[in-house]
Swiss-Prot record:
It catalyses: [ThiI sulfur-carrier protein]-S-sulfanyl-L-cysteine + a uridine in tRNA + 2 reduced [2Fe-2S]-[ferredoxin] + ATP + H(+) = [ThiI sulfur-carrier protein]-L-cysteine + a 4-thiouridine in tRNA + 2 oxidized [2Fe-2S]-[ferredoxin] + AMP + diphosphate; [ThiS sulfur-carrier protein]-C-terminal Gly-Gly-AMP + S-sulfanyl-L-cysteinyl-[cysteine desulfurase] + AH2 = [ThiS sulfur-carrier protein]-C-terminal-Gly-aminoethanethioate + L-cysteinyl-[cysteine desulfurase] + A + AMP + 2 H(+). Its main location: cytoplasm. Catalyzes the ATP-dependent transfer of a sulfur to tRNA to produce 4-thiouridine in position 8 of tRNAs, which functions as a near-UV photosensor. Also catalyzes the transfer of sulfur to the sulfur carrier protein ThiS, forming ThiS-thiocarboxylate. This is a step in the synthesis of thiazole, in the thiamine biosynthesis pathway. The sulfur is donated as persulfide by IscS. It comes from Yersinia enterocolitica serotype O:8 / biotype 1B (strain NCTC 13174 / 8081). This is tRNA sulfurtransferase.
């Protein structure tokens, strides 16, 4: 099985040296992502205008394709089959064999890319093959604009490449081609989408979380960060830094006037994140702020927030409306996380100012004990995001993990609905119920609490995190099922 990876167009217009660097980085990223497949026959080979992937294990095709569609820097992926040919009629015969079943009852067109010296042009092949397919396939019709099926062929000297399928890629730049950034992540719609947008633009995104809601809040945000990394950025190691910001909030509530609290809190977050960024050599902060979305996000207030630090602050969503942000969250898979994530920042100020005055803000901050800010930053927890799974095991030692179920146990499948549909969980004599992880916080209480529930997910990470969360909420009838 062979895949041809086409580069994002912005890569192809770079200078020769920059383009080569981008291609090398993309090739390395692909190898890092695919190494989890443990396929000894897998080969990744870079070329000037594309990257080839070959494997002798055809069963891995769907997994390879799925992984590639989530690697930044790829425009599209072609699933291809290389053949030799003798003449133009032979090209038609091979195309007919490959596409006969696909084109029955469909409109189609033929598109050919050709390299090398031949007695025919690309247009000649398109007309000859298209006409032949039209004559030999029942109810198939040629339609050059917006056909139902496009038959893609590539001819390189004496080699014919049949393109069996085309899959759209993520686009953007390969991660690592730009410098590192630190995303201020809250787990909501905005911070998840803004993190994704910087990953797609080639940045390795680290995460900084300001904990205002206890360990349950931290667990939820870790889930979002781990999901984003695992889905779009697993080619690189990244940090997850958690800062206990409750002492800072307490100091603000005690020392700062109500109307100024929102802006002061954001300035404190920027100061703390800037210290973290400087510690790890990160060049910029990323936030999910959008102009005018909340009181602290007016131009006047954003300028004052920026002035709290010399560190560059990137706001990829600055001109996006909320509906567009939610749509993007839905596309990348973070919507369900965000729906159930509590928003703590908005509750500390009852009458927030929309046009803060610098002198007033500085006066309010003069009452603040900055040693508290320094202390929480120094005590920040820094973990490799890959260790979140191991950390969850340590945190839930009080939650029993079992490999066998009793007849009275209820197996609770907490995987996402699409995963449940793809691999339904069935065990003889055991009651199996489905409740996606993002609904546990709101719907677990509705279940029969006289029963014992064993939480299940594919790798055991989400089930452990959710078991810890439910334990903290006072539920003692939960365990983790790991067969």
């Amino acid at each position: 099985m062979k895949f041809i990876i086409k580069l994002f167009p912005e890569i192809t217009i770079k200078s020769q040296s920059v383009r080569l660097r981008f291609i090398k980085i993309l090739t390395t990223n692909i190898r890092n992502v695919l190494k989890n497949l443990e396929d000894d026959t897998l080969a990744v080979v870079r070329h000037w205008d594309h990257i080839e992937i070959r494997t002798k294990d055809d069963n891995l095709g769907p997994q390879i394709c799925d992984a590639l569609t989530r690697v930044p820097g790829i425009h599209h992926i072609l699933e291809v089959e290389d053949r030799s040919y003798t003449d133009m009629h032979n090209i038609f015969e091979q195309t007919l064999e490959a596409y006969r079943e696909t084109l029955i009852g469909k409109t189609f067109c033929v598109r050919v890319k050709r390299r090398g010296k031949h007695e025919f042009s690309s247009g000649d092949v398109e007309r000859y093959v298209g006409g032949g397919l039209n004559q030999h396939i029942e109810s198939a019709k040629v339609k050059l604009t917006h056909p139902q099926v496009t038959v893609h062929l590539e001819i390189d000297q004496d080699k014919l490449t049949l393109i069996k399928a085309r899959h759209e890629g993520l686009g953007g730049f390969p991660i690592g081609t730009q410098e590192d950034v630190l995303s201020l992540i809250s787990g909501g719609f905005d911070s998840g989408v803004s993190s994704y947008m910087l990953m797609r633009r080639g940045c390795r995104v680290h995460y900084c979380f300001f904990n205002l809601g206890g360990s349950a809040h931290e667990i939820g945000v870790k889930q979002v960060a781990h999901y984003l990394w695992n889905r779009f950025g697993s080619s690189h190691r990244v940090r997850f830094v958690a800062i206990d910001f409750e002492p800072v909030v307490g100091e603000i509530l005690e020392k700062v006037e109500d109307g100024q609290m929102g802006v002061v809190l954001k300035r404190m977050m920027v100061r703390a994140a800037s210290q973290v960024a400087e510690r790890y050599g990160v060049q910029a902060l990323v936030t999910g702020e959008a102009l005018g979305q909340v009181s602290s996000q007016t131009l006047t207030n954003l300028r004052l927030i920026d002035n709290a630090s010399d560190t560059l602050i990137l706001r990829p969503l600055i001109s996006h409306d909320k509906e567009h942000i939610i749509n993007l969250a839905r596309e990348i898979g973070t919507e369900d996380f965000a729906k159930t994530m509590p928003e703590y920042c908005g509750v500390i100020s009852k009458s927030p100012t929309v046009k803060a005055v610098k002198a007033k803000i500085e006066e309010e901050e003069s009452h603040f004990d900055f040693s508290i800010l320094d202390r929480v930053v120094n005590e920040a927890k820094n973990v490799d995001i890959r260790e979140i799974a191991a950390q969850s095991r340590e945190q839930v030692v009080e939650v029993e993990t079992v490999a066998e179920l009793a007849d009275t146990d209820v197996l609770l499948d907490i995987r996402a609905p699409d995963e449940q549909d793809e691999k339904p969980l069935k065990l003889d004599g055991i009651e199996v119920r489905t409740l996606p992880f993002y609904k546990l916080s709101t719907q677990f209480a509705d279940l029969d609490q006289s029963k014992s529930y064993l939480l299940y997910c594919d790798r055991g990470v989400m089930s452990r995190l959710q078991a810890l969360y439910l334990r903290e909420q006072g539920y003692t009838n939960v365990k983790v099922y790991r067969p």
